[in-house]
Regions:
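Residues that flank catalytic or metal-binding motifs in active/ligand-binding sites
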Residues: 122, 238-240, 263-265, 483, ...
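Compact beta-rich and alpha/beta scaffold cores in large eukaryotic transport/transcription complexes
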Residues: 114-119, 125-127, 262-264, 268-281, ...
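Beta-strand-rich assembly/attachment modules of structural machines
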Residues: 2-166
Length: 551
């Protein structure tokens, strides 16, 4: 006897039931309030926040996010936070869990206000843990004490993620190593030896394989810069995203066998944009998001992206996977009568100048060659016509020096005919970037590229959307996109045009009557160009050698 086979109708009914169950689960997750908890300076839980008046927490791509929490003055957590002398530690920490994402930060200030009606409220202000990266210096030699810093600068070349992580790790280890500095509590013997174990550090990072890192190469050079300042241009150039996670009780191990202390902040650098590979950068609603690869045109100035064939994206094959793959963005926020966009602001700035001028000082060696030629000619003339003991070359050079100095090979001008044709017959003409006072050098070439980039067209799109209409915001499989992901938005007046940019800011805010997300897509301050990256790497290498005293 054969087993009964499942009919097509039963299969379809099962798929429908599973889909509806998933929809109900996601709807329930979206309506769940955020889990807000306050912790003291040693990461002891002080309480779960409820009954707040309002709250707002912001994620900013590769920069410090801010948070505010307003509580009634009679709230027990408000009294605890405002009474700075009674609590054991001065610092107050906060964690906010919503849709798979965790916002964590440290209190930067507290204010007690009295309103016109006599009510008092306490406002707590926080900075997220991206701020910590602005307080970590990259020493010239992290393994030696401050009195002995040889070589002069910390220099490292390699893939961007690996190089930045190694620079961060060495200086985290320096901060926790008690060989040359006192621990926080010198009387605690365990702090003299236990800090060699990264699980006990307040800040750590995920490891990175050198051979497995395919991010763009860079030159890291620092002489006591902050890690944030050191990393900012490299992160912007490669469109990488710094993330952090705060380990709390009940969380899974960050990686197998690693159990950090409660409250440890773990940093990572990830590529969520796919900018230097092939990714979505534009398109229309009829053909979808076009996948393109960056290409530098023959004139060395203009850039274009070439359309490439759509590859297979294995991440989207699983029916339970939720998110955006870096190489295949797919989320499209459309304007219209029935839309999840509650308000939006689209900003476009056209390109300005069609020619960039740099210079002011002659190329190295030019003034010296002219000076030597004048002195040689003067010496030969005086020896021939006056006598061998008469030397007029130096006199002539001194008199003529104000006339010839910085006149030959002192300026460079480069025009983009393509930009001129795109802008039309009437347009702005010339632009001179800052810090470009010497022509025909690596710095001048870099300044030209920076000039083109500073005057190119810019696109920014700020939207406020209703969560779950139809896309959800969240991380770690709880949302369709999050900070750093590339998503598309429709042009408000050109109905069929798609603008694809990175999510640069996320703002989660609520009060006693509303809840919502603000999304900022794109930025009017753009990253470096392709050739600028190459020149900056060479220039960084030269600067590193100069700091080391080699050049």
């Amino acid at each position: 006897m054969t087993a009964p086979t499942q009919s097509v109708q039963d299969t379809l009914d099962g798929i429908l039931a599973a889909t509806e169950a998933a929809q109900r689960e996601r709807a329930q997750q979206r309506t769940e309030p955020a889990l807000v908890r306050l912790w003291d300076g040693d990461w002891n839980l002080r309480g779960r926040v409820s009954g707040e008046i309002k709250a707002e927490f912001r994620w900013v791509l590769n920069n410090t996010g801010t948070g505010t929490l307003t509580l009634p003055a009679d709230h027990y957590l408000a009294k605890w936070a405002a009474d700075t002398n009674s609590r054991g530690t001065k610092n107050v920490h906060i964690t906010v869990d919503k849709d798979g994402a965790r916002w964590g930060g440290r209190m930067s200030g507290v204010s007690v206000r009295k309103k016109d009606n006599g009510d008092r409220e306490v406002e707590l202000r926080f900075l997220d843990f991206m701020e910590d990266l602005k307080h970590i210096r990259v020493w010239a030699n992290p393994v030696l004490p401050a009195a002995i810093q040889f070589p002069r600068a910390f220099t490292l070349a390699g893939p961007s993620i690996w190089a930045l992580k190694l620079a961060l790790f060495l200086n985290l280890m320096r901060n926790q190593n008690s060989l040359f500095t006192l621990p926080d509590n010198p009387l605690d013997f365990s702090q003299w030896t236990g800090n060699l174990n990264m699980e006990n550090w307040p800040v750590s990072m995920r490891g990175q394989s050198l051979l497995g890192d395919s991010s763009p190469h860079c030159v890291v050079s620092s002489r006591f810069k902050t890690w944030h300042d050191l990393a900012a241009p490299i992160l912007a150039d490669a469109q990488l995203c710094v993330t952090y996670e705060v380990y709390l009780p009940g969380d899974p191990e960050p990686w197998p066998g690693y159990t950090p202390r409660v409250g440890q902040v773990i940093y990572d650098i990830v590529d969520k944009s796919g900018w230097w590979g092939s990714t979505g950068t534009g398109g229309n609603i009829f053909q979808g998001i076009a996948r393109t690869a960056m290409q530098l045109l023959e004139n060395g100035v203009d850039m274009d992206r070439t359309v490439v064939s759509d590859p297979n994206s294995p991440d989207f094959r699983g029916n339970d996977w939720l998110g955006t793959a870096p190489g295949a963005p797919w989320v499209v926020l459309r304007e219209g009568e029935l839309t999840g966009i509650q308000s939006s602001e689209f900003t476009y700035q056209p390109a300005t100048d069609v020619q960039v001028v740099v210079g002011g000082h002659s190329m190295p060696g030019v003034n010296e060659v002219i000076s030597s030629a004048i002195q040689l000619a003067g010496d030969l003339a005086s020896s021939t016509f006056i006598g061998p003991n008469v030397n007029l070359g130096q006199v002539a050079d001194t008199l003529l020096q104000p006339l010839y100095t910085d006149t030959l090979l002192a300026w460079m001008a480069f025009k983009s005919t393509r930009r001129a044709q795109e802008l039309g017959w009437s347009h702005y003409f010339e632009y001179m970037p800052s810090n470009a006072d010497r022509a025909y050098t690596l710095s001048s070439l870099m300044a030209i590229r920076r000039g083109w980039w500073e005057t190119r067209e810019r696109v920014g799109h700020h939207v406020k959307i209703a969560d779950g209409a139809p896309y959800t915001i969240g991380a770690n499989g709880r949302g369709h996109f999050f900070i750093g992901d590339r998503i598309a938005t429709t042009h408000p007046l050109v109905a069929d045009k798609l603008v694809v940019e990175q999510v640069t800011e996320l703002d989660l805010s609520w009060d006693r009557s509303s809840f919502g997300w603000d999304v900022t897509v794109g930025s009017l301050s753009r990253t470096e160009s392709g050739l600028d990256q190459v020149v900056r790497q060479v220039s960084s290498g030269v600067s590193a050698l100069q700091e080391l005293g080699v050049l």
